[in-house]
Amino acid sequence: MANCENNPWKKNAWGKNEETAEEPIVSFADVLSEEFIEDLSVQEKLEEERYMKQLDQMFGDTSVSDDQLPINTEGMTDEEVALALQRHFDREADVARAVGSSSSVHFTPDRYHPKTMQETDSENEDDDALRQAATDMLYAKLDEENATNSRLRPEGPSTSRTKHDTGVSGRRNADKTFNDRNTLPTGDMVGDKLNNKVFNKLMAFGKSESKRQMRNKDKEEKATMDTSVDSDTRLLLLKWINQGVFDSVDGIIATGKESAVLHAAQDSATSYAIKVYKTTLSEFKNRSEYVKDDFRFKNPRGVLKIWAEREFMNLSRMAKHGLPCPQPVKVRRNVLVMSFLGDQGLAAPRLKNVEWEFFTDDERRNVYDQVQSIMCRMYKECLLVHADLSEFNLLLTPDNKVHVIDVSQAMDLSHPRSLQFLTRDIQNIITFFTRIGTPNLPTYVQLFNLITDLDMVEDHDLLVQVEQFSEENRSVDLRHDKSRPADMELKKYNEEKKANRGISPAREYN
């Protein structure tokens, strides 16, 4: 017990022990009854009246000045003083509320308002006056300089400037040119001026230059317009170098309308030609003649993938029959690796670039006989038509041996227009060798009959006869293939792919 009495935490702040008030136990039915509620309200009123009578006895009717407290605090604790003051304030509020109950205006004692409520958020009147005066002076000055009304214009010569002033417009044009990205790089133009004529020309040139740059078909990482080597192609070449297919890629041998040829070396004695097909065939205007209505030629990169694989298959067929052509090595997407035709890293010249004035008639005739043999063997043994044979696609090696290249567009004899393309090849070859002075050349019809073993009339136009022959001798399968060229090309593609595969026990079941 002594410990409990000496414990400061067990005492009240006012020096008295706390006595727990025991609340009376009331049933739930009594709480809901109206009589019980009325009794509680009556008891509260009686207690309030008792407190009011005590206050009246304590203070009486004497008035209290502002310097005096309303109660005698002698012998009272702080809690008793606070309670007495609170009851006094409550009584004053009740009296004021009772007096003003009959009026529509209610008065509340100011002593209950905090000081923050009496302050305002408005700005200082002096600051507002100064700000307004400064604003008026600024507008008055602007009105004097830029007044357009004659009544407001000051006397004497005019000093106002408009946006059409030479100096103002010159500085504005220089600033626009300096900050415009579409025009040429200008460097530091601080303090310079440009007249309207020069500025308009620069802006027009900048717009035309930006439009010209946007006319490129593909982006830089996808397009192969110039060198045919984009990021994907470079990555593929690097992978082949790591695999040991070749050691280095030296440079460009030649460029054409659909591809570019690069030189690759494995050692001092072995070289390869890498043919990279362009992903944009803007220069190959008549490509549709070769691949019209073919489902494989919708996507540009899909086109070049099939185009490279098609040349690989044609070269494989020609090499299988022993025709003079590059030996195919590897193909992937739009990149084809084949043997290099040339000597000591120098590519063999095309017939177009050969200096024929140093050749004799017999040597020229020998070159023609080789070309004629290539055309006949391609038609009869390989069942192919070059479809783009000319002096640009024939190479002459140092030992005067002719090799045929660029057979990506070569087509099978089942193609509906194979004879028409053969006729064009014959015309190109005869025209070229006639121009270089080759003796004893056959006519178009004679060479056509020699290659195809047909009997065309010499006196009539060869192309007309070929078209008529194609119409009259086309079989039912050819008519069906012409109406569905995609199905025909897919069938031939699968047959060639199956024929070029090696011997396998599962070949009959695939």
Curated annotation (Swiss-Prot):
Keyword Zinc-finger recorded = no
Q: Where does ATP bind?
A: 241-249, 275
- The UniProt record lists the keyword Metal-binding: yes
Recorded GO cellular component terms are:
cytosol; preribosome, small subunit precursor
Task: Provide the free-text tissue specificity comment from this protein's UniProt record.
Answer: Expressed in tail neurons (PVQ and PHAL/PQR).
**GO molecular function term, any single one:** metal ion binding
| Ranges annotated as biased composition (Basic and acidic residues) | 108-118, 162-179, 474-499
The Swiss-Prot or TrEMBL record lists the needed cofactor(s) as: Mg(2+)
In this chain, the stretch annotated as Disordered covers 100-126, 143-191, 474-510
Q: What happens when the gene is disrupted?
A: RNAi-mediated knockdown causes no obvious phenotype.
- Domain named Protein kinase: residues: 235-510
**Organism domain of life:** Eukaryota
At the top of the EC hierarchy, this enzyme's class is: transferase
Identify the EC number(s). Answer: 2.7.11.1
User: Keywords in UniProt for this one?
Assistant: ATP-binding, Kinase, Magnesium, Metal-binding, Nucleotide-binding, Serine/threonine-protein kinase, Transferase
**Which family does the similarity line name?**
Belongs to the protein kinase superfamily. RIO-type Ser/Thr kinase family.
The molecule here is called Serine/threonine-protein kinase RIO3
User: Whose protein is this, by species?
Assistant: Caenorhabditis elegans
